[in-house]
């Protein structure tokens, strides 16, 4: 989140402006930016005495092909992914420079299994249950944009398809969720 205030994040902020996101929305969804340096998070955590092996196991850093530790996400808009209890369990990252893949998620782990998580369920679940209404849209930016327009009972799968587990999860909060995916190719 702090990196969004850096000069290096100007490109990211320009993207958020083109998407017409307000500062309040950016804060609400705790959006961030991963630095242009491929090891800035690793270097910061090492300075705080975190152990390399623990950081590697956490999947927020990885070994590159030259066996150098680097941040898993860098030069990306960052979307924290929360479980239904509001705890961060992973991250999504969107490239802003045209590189592929456009979106990446944290690697699967014991606490992050994307097939079992709906983005924004932590914020949408109470309204969904109260109104028996849940909209499942395609991605992070769809959720955030709709939420900013006042549609708060909205979630998204963490990938190009809705899993059976995610559909079952939605039924815990709404008897008939509405699925509204884009008409274009996923991504």
Where are these regions (language model features)?
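Non-catalytic accessory segments of DNA primases and related replication-initiation nucleases
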Residues: 1-53, 106
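Phosphate-handling DNA/RNA-contact segment within nucleic-acid enzymes
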Residues: 35-177
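Phosphate/diphosphate-binding loops
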Residues: 182-186
